Amino acid sequence: MIADKLFEKVEKNGVVCVGLDTSLDYIPEEFKSKFSNESDMLFAFNKEIIDATLDVSACFKVQIAYYEALGLKGLESYKNTLSYLREKNALIIADIKRGDIAATAKMYAKAHFEGDFESDFITLNPYMGMDSIDPYLPYIEKNEKGVFVLVRTSNKGAEDIEYLEAGHGKKVYDVVGEKLNTLGKNYLGKHGYSSIGGVVGCTHQEEAKEMRDKLDTMPFLIPGYGAQGGTAKDVAAYLKNGNGGIVNSSRKILLAYKAMEDSKNFAECARKEAISMRDSIREAILK
């Protein structure tokens, strides 16, 4: 199960998930000047970040929107980034947030679990119901793939739907999480975690212990750290014995060179930030 590979990466490298949500605005001007086209520039920047953070991160999350926005050249960079990550034996989360059903979802599964855009995990939106998850299950069972499904996100608008009362003292996110946790028990790895994970933001610490206890076999993809206000202490509450989840950081890592005022060595700055993040979370876990 891919869940075991993720667990073991976390044990070895820590919980950091490097977000390659790479906007052209994030790339230092002196680095940009080396390239004549955006596709090569974007991929080269990502490659530098990957090389600098590979051994201090559990995985990489690539947000497809940043590449789609650049058209075919952007998708070429996306493809090349995924290919390079596979070459480096890195675990890849394609942040695509698909949410359709039936034949359409089957095509999404084929597109992102096979071929040019192949990744290890993808993100899904469950709003249409559990049958929006079904087309991905054969890949989980037979092809060592996994999914992270939106459960309780870190954005302000999460309260519009996710926090609505669903009856019996439960909110919508409770119901979604429980259904996914039950389904996930059919796809457990040897370390006790499923290849069906949940996206759970770290910006509501008061709910952390209850969610971690209830969703006992679900690995968490945890956004909200850094730029969205989440702290190491917030994150630690969603983990179990230092595992059971990965913590995404995009801007804080990609733009570390700005805080450190060292654009020439942007990749090394990204590495330092990833190490600092990893160590801060480890310290928070031990407290």
UniProtKB/Swiss-Prot annotation:
Pfam families: OMPdecase. It catalyses: orotidine 5'-phosphate + H(+) = UMP + CO2. The active site is at K97 (proton donor). One of its GO terms (molecular function) is orotidine-5'-phosphate decarboxylase activity. SMART domains: OMPdecase. Belongs to the OMP decarboxylase family. Type 2 subfamily. Pathway: Pyrimidine metabolism; UMP biosynthesis via de novo pathway; UMP from orotate: step 2/2. This is Orotidine 5'-phosphate decarboxylase. It comes from the Bacteria.
